[in-house]
A protein has these predicted regions:
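Sec-dependent signal peptide recognition
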Residues: 2-8
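C-terminal motif of bacterial Sec signal peptides marking the signal peptidase cleavage site
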Residues: 15-16
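N-terminal "domain-start" segment that seeds a small globular fold
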Residues: 24-56, 76, 141
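Conserved helix-turn-beta segment immediately C-terminal to the redox Cys motif
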Residues: 61-62, 71, 75-99, 118-122
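Thiol-based oxidoreductase modules, predominantly thioredoxin-like and allied folds used
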Residues: 67, 92-109, 124-136
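Short, internal strand/loop/helix patches
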Residues: 112-161
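Thiol-/selenol-based redox modules, centered on thioredoxin-like
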Residues: 141-144, 148-195
Length: 195
């Protein structure tokens, strides 16, 4: 008798749960989820001089975005960055530098000090933007785009250190992320520029 009562209770519970499950419906027929891949052309930032830089002016160009620092072991990459910029700038290629103080406080200077350092030590002529944050809660909008797959459509990434490179194709879309230690003159980078 005890087993029969237990069986009846189990059956009643099972059927009551089935009814509840059948009554819950999620209507997805009229819902369309659209994730549109963004591009860099939506961004406007300030350069080191305080002038507005509009990324939409770069349509049709390949772009390398790199976070920079003046007091880093990788700072000599400025020389290689400037070299490839000079060599390929007339072939629809541009480098955009974003000074950042996120790693070891290796970019403590003001915008004016950064501009002076870049010019005096490396003759930098490629566009340098206002100092920004490239990670954490105060990460700037363009780096949110670069590091979040939901925005760039390619991949999630963390900025590992100073001089991480983001390669943007002619349509303003993120195409590749290059590690900080990889030189700007690496064959994989040059091949991408020339392709």
């Amino acid at each position: 008798m005890k087993n029969l009562l237990m069986l009846a209770c189990s059956a009643a519970l099972l059927f009551s749960c089935q009814d509840k499950a059948q009554n819950i419906k999620i209507d997805t027929n009229n819902t369309e989820i659209v994730m549109e891949k963004q591009n860099i052309y939506q961004f406007k930032v300030e350069d080191l001089s305080g002038n507005t830089f509009d990324f939409s002016t770069l349509k049709g160009k390949k772009v390398m975005i790199v976070n920079t620092a003046s007091k880093c072991g990788l700072t000599p990459q400025y020389k290689d960055l400037e070299a490839i910029y000079k060599e390929y700038k007339d072939q629809n290629f541009v480098i955009i530098g974003f000074p950042a103080n996120n790693f070891g406080s290796q970019e403590p200077g003001t915008n004016e000090e950064i501009a002076s350092f870049c010019q005096q030590n490396y003759g930098v002529t490629f566009p340098m933007m206002d100092k920004v944050s490239v990670k954490g809660g105060d990460m700037c909008a363009i780096y949110q785009f670069l590091t979040q797959k939901s925005k760039n459509g390619l991949e999630n990434s963390d900025v590992a250190w100073n001089f991480q490179k983001y390669l943007i194709n002619e349509n303003g879309e993120l195409e590749k992320v290059i590690a900080p230690q990889t030189l700007p003159t690496d064959a994989s980078v040059i091949d991408w520029i020339k392709a």
